[in-house]
């Protein structure tokens, strides 16, 4: 069974091209900076609805919350 060609460029040609590295020297660090800003600004907490570190325990409630009726419909 002979494999055919898909018409795509070989990966080795892509990685060794100047154009690849010109594009990716900008995009790869940009992704890291965007992720760092997403987390450091607190936007990740707002988007995913998780409590911020200072919101786990409030002034009124300092003990660990225990769930007794987790699957109750009441």
Swiss-Prot record:
InterPro entries hit by this protein: PSII_cyt_b559_asu, PSII_cyt_b559_asu_sf, PSII_cyt_b559_CS, PSII_cyt_b559_N, PSII_cytb559_asu_lum
Location(s) in or outside the cell: Plastid, Cyanelle thylakoid membrane
GO biological process, one term: photosynthetic electron transport chain
Transmembrane annotation, as ranges: 22-36
Membrane disposition: Single-pass membrane protein
Cofactors (names): heme b
Primary localization: plastid
Keyword Protein transport: no
Annotated heme binding sites: 24
Keyword Transmembrane helix carried by entry: yes
Molecular function per GO: electron transfer activity; heme binding; iron ion binding
GO cellular component, one term: cyanelle thylakoid membrane
Note on how the cofactor is bound: With its partner (PsbF) binds heme. PSII binds additional chlorophylls, carotenoids and specific lipids.
Role played: This b-type cytochrome is tightly associated with the reaction center of photosystem II (PSII). PSII is a light-driven water:plastoquinone oxidoreductase that uses light energy to abstract electrons from H(2)O, generating O(2) and a proton gradient subsequently used for ATP formation. It consists of a core antenna complex that captures photons, and an electron transfer chain that converts photonic excitation into a charge separation.
Subunit structure, as described in the record: Heterodimer of an alpha subunit and a beta subunit. PSII is composed of 1 copy each of membrane proteins PsbA, PsbB, PsbC, PsbD, PsbE, PsbF, PsbH, PsbI, PsbJ, PsbK, PsbL, PsbM, PsbT, PsbX, PsbY, PsbZ, Psb30/Ycf12, at least 3 peripheral proteins of the oxygen-evolving complex and a large number of cofactors. It forms dimeric complexes.
Family: Belongs to the PsbE/PsbF family.
Annotated PANTHER family: CYTOCHROME B559 SUBUNIT BETA-RELATED
Protein name as catalogued: Cytochrome b559 subunit alpha
Gene: psbE
